UniProtKB/Swiss-Prot annotation:
Single annotated GO MF: translation release factor activity, codon specific
Protein name: Peptide chain release factor subunit 1
GO cellular component terms attached to this protein's record: cytoplasm
Annotated transmembrane regions: none
Function description: Directs the termination of nascent peptide synthesis (translation) in response to the termination codons UAA, UAG and UGA.
Compartment(s): Cytoplasm
């Protein structure tokens, strides 16, 4: 699924999550790709019969209307779409007004279950599960003093376990022969490696089917001894992607490991976002091919000067088009999501009417794509994504050229 599709899907779920209904009036119907449409229609007719017995007149009327609306939509399908579909229907409150909505959602992944659900809100949990980051890497950093095990989930690093060793230092205590001391030290190292292997198994085996790979970091020869000694469970051992030199073996070591492994993790979003922002900041620092802020970036897009558009997934603004009902004059303004402040037409002194309202991230991305520009979406879960959002207003661009006489 592309970044843009993922963003659109996420925004749709956010919109549906806001809707509330009375009692159990909101219907959510999950239809898997292999479900027979005729069987679904038959069950809905049965639900229609049962809904006729609902005591509350208003609830009964709204539930019956919702089921009828879904049945009407199903008439247009001989079979479910490739990934199945989810149909939502019911009377919701939108800006203080009640409105009956019916929508069909074709999710990015196969619908996992058949379910007919009535509640005061739409049942979205299986759809939200599809938004969870699928790229998962195991992280292990160790030396002979301590070890930390963690996960890289898309952009986030999570510590799963940490422990210290009982391995003595290299200098023996008085009264011990050097040979005996070295033997005891080797036994302690071996026991610690076993302990780290068990710690990794306990922390990472539950994720083994989802793990893309495992990265091991630490000083030499510790990480090599640990890996080559096969202290890891065989299911984890075969997933090791590489060994990397790191100076820290606590939580900060996990971050250092991800940085050192960036060639291996080139496609992981945390590295992708870091590289994009470094490229952008380099241009900003030398007053080069960079632009930020909606107005400036929009101007460069329209001039065909944008090479890569950087957008924050957390922007919640809309581009609204208004038209004067008398003279037909049109204006476009950007407002915070949900804000309704129609401007006045100065010539006719009347309030303008809303014609169109679009999510600004989608509007700008489509405008940029129409000029051949690349579009990159950054979340605020990474430091770089947060910088884009807070320092540059969530909208920035790397330019092909500066049409106004710059570089």
């Amino acid at each position: 699924m592309s970044q843009k599709m993922m963003y659109e899907f996420k925004r749709k779920l956010e919109e549906l999550e806001k809707y509330k209904g009375r009692g159990t009036e909101l219907i959510t119907l999950y239809i898997p790709p292999d479900k027979n449409i005729a069987d679904v229609s038959n069950q809905l007719r049965s639900e229609l019969s049962q809904a006729s017995n609902i005591k509350s007149k208003q609830t009964r009327t709204n539930v019956l209307a919702g089921i009828e609306a879904i049945l009407n939509r199903l008439k247009h399908f001989r079979k479910p779409p490739e990934n199945g579909m989810v149909i939502i229907s019911g009377v919701v409150n939108i800006n203080g007004k009640e409105k009956h909505i019916t929508e069909i959602i074709e999710p990015p992944e196969p619908v996992p279950l058949y379910k007919y659900h009535c509640d005061s809100k739409f049942y979205l949990d299986p759809l939200k599960e599809m938004l969870t980051e699928k790229k998962l890497y195991g992280l292990i950093v160790l030396d002979r003093r301590e070890a930390t095990v963690g996960l890289l989930k898309g952009k986030r690093i999570e510590v799963l376990d940490w422990d210290t060793s009982m391995v003595p230092g290299k200098h023996r205590q008085g009264g011990q022969s050097s040979v005996r001391f070295e033997r005891l030290r080797e036994i302690a190292i071996h026991e610690f490696y076993k302990k780290v292997g068990e710690m990794a198994s306990e922390a990472l085996l539950p994720y083994k089917d989802k793990l893309i790979g495992i990265l091991i970091g630490g000083p030499s020869p510790t990480k090599e001894e640990f890996y080559e000694g096969e202290y890891l469970h065989h299911e984890l051992q075969k997933k090791v992607l590489g060994l990397f030199d790191v100076g820290y073996t606590d939580e900060s070591g996990l971050y250092e490991l991800v940085e050192k492994a960036k060639d291996v993790l080139q496609e992981v979003d945390i590295i992708r976002e870091k590289n994009l922002m470094q490229r952008f900041l380099k241009e900003v620092a030398r007053d080069g091919l960079a632009a930020y802020g909606e107005e400036e970036v929009r101007r460069y897009i329209e001039l065909g000067a944008v090479d890569t558009l950087l957008l924050s997934e957390d922007l919640r603004y809309e581009r609204v088009k208004y038209r004067c009902p008398k003279c037909g004059k049109e204006v476009e303004v950007t407002v915070r999501e949900g804000i309704e402040k129609p401007p006045f037409c100065e010539e006719d002194n009347v309030e303008m009417e809303e014609v169109e309202r679009r999510d600004i991230v989608l509007e700008l991305s489509e405008l940029a794509e129409s000029t051949g520009a690349k579009v990159e979406f950054l979340s605020t879960e990474s430091e770089e994504g947060e910088m884009l959002y807070k320092a540059f207003g969530g909208i920035a661009a790397i330019l092909r050229f500066k049409p106004d006489g710059g570089q």
